[in-house]
Amino acid sequence: MAGRSNIVVSATVRDALAAGAPVVALESTLIAHGLPRPRNRDVAVELEELARARGVTPATIAVIDGVPRVGLDEPDLRRIADDANVIKLSVRDLPVACATGWTGATTVASTALLAARVGIRLFATGGLGGVHRGAGDSFDESADLVTLAAMPITVVSAGVKSILDIGATLERLETLGITVVGYRTSTFPGFYLPHTTYDLDWRVGDAGQVAATMAAADLLGLTSAIVVANPLPTDQALDPALHDRVLADALAWATERGIRGKAVTPFLLETFHRETGGASLEVNINAVRNNVAVASDIALAWAAKDRSPTDPAAPDPTAPDPAAPDPTAPDPAAPDSAAPDLAGPDPSAPDPAAVARAHRP
């Protein structure tokens, strides 16, 4: 049969998962398409080392020659970083790429899908895709949203880029049943900026609270993602005045040039990079670094919870078996002296035979 599609998990990642050790998934689109060469390769290695330094196994995900791989070795990571022919693969592209033997970098959506398929519960990325500006006319919405609605994975991100429609994105996340929590923040971050004008319903204070939320979601049988919105520290974010000026100019230029639909977002990103003198690129890298650190902490908390005998998500061995009968309860098969036996004769009723004899002539 032509094509290959079985997911191959590296030995390191496979052993970590089997042992219940912490694992964090990493996307490869940032490496292949989000950063300039050769810095992209250095950042890819740095992010993996950042996870390892915290005691977590990194699992960078990509498709190599038609085979989805969870955990890349050094040659594969170098290939994703250096080869200009590496394509960008979202969920819809995976079956074709696998069938035809292509090599591609995975987006947030396809990374989340492949990670969840092999049992990875944590995923760190820079920012989520979302609803694009003007989506009311173009229907341009990232596949990240609908994919996360069906994947039981926790994604740590710095929100969504301010070039997107943040309000509409939050509405879609709510509609799709995706839990969103702010990590030590009550406002949704805007990727380049630590805060936006959009308030969040839920705030968590540490990695343990996120792990507890994951356990509660499992108990409820939920199969959608949890999005952990982790804002950049103020000193690592883009200058707010510069951000607002560049965004206003970029939107105006897009309108003047008749740029619409799917062409808007790449134009805005390119404009941000040019007009900020590359500062937006540094923000992007800082965001991913911070998110890998937080995702690693959550993965550690999740692994500890999974192994703990007091894990609220695990059954209590000292609790009574709900399937076993209660020894203090009355035997439902025994007659109840306080209730009439509907199947037996009523002793207070007259004997029909005696009544018949009394009326015999």
From Swiss-Prot:
It catalyses: D-ribose 5-phosphate + uracil = psi-UMP + H2O. InterPro entries: Indigdn_synthA-like (IPR022830), PsuG (IPR007342). GO terms for molecular function: hydrolase activity, acting on glycosyl bonds; metal ion binding; pseudouridylate synthase activity. GO terms for cellular component: cytoplasm. Disulfide bonds: none annotated. Signal peptide: none annotated. Mn(2+) binds at residue 140. It is an enzyme of class 4 (lyase). It comes from the Bacteria. Substrate binds at residues 88, 108, 142-144. One of its GO terms (biological process) is nucleobase catabolic process. Residues 312-333 have a biased composition (Pro residues). Gene3D superfamilies: Indigoidine synthase domain (3.40.1790.10). Keywords: Glycosidase, Hydrolase, Lyase, Manganese, Metal-binding. Residues 306-361 are annotated as: Disordered. Its cofactor is Mn(2+). Its EC number is 4.2.1.70. Homotrimer. HAMAP family: PsiMP_glycosidase (MF_01876). Catalyzes the reversible cleavage of pseudouridine 5'-phosphate (PsiMP) to ribose 5-phosphate and uracil. Functions biologically in the cleavage direction, as part of a pseudouridine degradation pathway. Belongs to the pseudouridine-5'-phosphate glycosidase family. This is Pseudouridine-5'-phosphate glycosidase. It comes from Frankia alni (strain DSM 45986 / CECT 9034 / ACN14a). The gene is psuG.
